Amino acid sequence: HREEQARYIVKNKPVTMSCAASPATQIYFKCNGEWLHQKAHHIEEREDETTGRSVREVQTDVSRQQVEELFGLEDYWCQCVAWSAAGTSKSRKAYVRLAYLRKNFEQKPLGKYALLDHEVLLHCRPPDAIPQAEVEWLKSEEIIDPVIDQNFYITVDHNLIIKQTRLADSANYTCVAKNLVAKRRSSTATITVYVNGGW
């Protein structure tokens, strides 16, 4: 059995669910407990190059509208059911979710004055998103890579720590959130590093 994992509908593009079983005399999709109409299936039979056995593969498209019609009840899911002389086998449920990335950051970084050689913390809580947004930080529009510059540390909850400020860390910092749908930028925070007793 080759099985499906969670799939995401981006904007209005349907997702294609596919499933293959060998051996199988029949193979169909069941979505949210209901059998899909035969017309909604695209079934192909082919030979597995390694085993030489016959493989039956089924595909179906799931549209945004289908997922929205189930709104509020539960996640939309499909499962593949195959029959053969040996009996029936079912795949795990594969979920179809509507992908989105909200516009507003839950917490934005704020500019500040920072004393030379001191630690600075910049907060970032990305917008609500499915699938969860990945976060990166920009320093003057360049991506910060803590592996290369170990004076920077990005926490598990997406905050940026400058361990010991250097004069070169005076810059504009921006938090960027991205997923399948879009890329969003927080407002920019300006860090000004100063030397005690003077600028």
Swiss-Prot record:
Keyword Glycoprotein among UniProt keywords: yes
Single Gene Ontology BP annotation: cell-cell adhesion
Gene Ontology MF term list: cell adhesion molecule binding
Gene3D superfamilies: Immunoglobulins (2.60.40.10)
Membrane topology term: Single-pass type I membrane protein
Hydrolase keyword on record: no
One Gene Ontology cellular component: plasma membrane
Membrane side Extracellular: residue ranges: 1-199
Alphabetical keyword list: Developmental protein, Disulfide bond, Glycoprotein, Immunoglobulin domain, Membrane, Phosphoprotein, Receptor
Domain Ig-like C2-type: from-to ranges: 103-192
Main localization category: membrane
Record PTM text: Phosphorylated on cytoplasmic tyrosine residues.
One Pfam assignment: I-set
Localization per record: Membrane
Family stated for the protein in its record: Belongs to the unc-5 family.
InterPro entries in the record: Cell_adhesion_signaling (IPR051275), Ig-like_dom (IPR007110), Ig-like_dom_sf (IPR036179), Ig-like_fold (IPR013783), Ig_I-set (IPR013098), Ig_sub (IPR003599), Ig_sub2 (IPR003598)
Tissue: Expressed in the spinal cord, primarily in neurons of the lateral gray matter and in dorsal cells. Also expressed in reticulospinal neurons.
Function of the protein: Receptor for netrin required for axon guidance. Mediates axon repulsion of neuronal growth cones in the developing nervous system upon ligand binding.
Protein name: Netrin receptor unc-5 homolog
Annotated SMART domains: IG, IGc2
Species whose genome carries this gene: Petromyzon marinus
Disulfide bonding pattern of the chain: 124-175
Coiled coil: none
Glycosylation (residues): 172
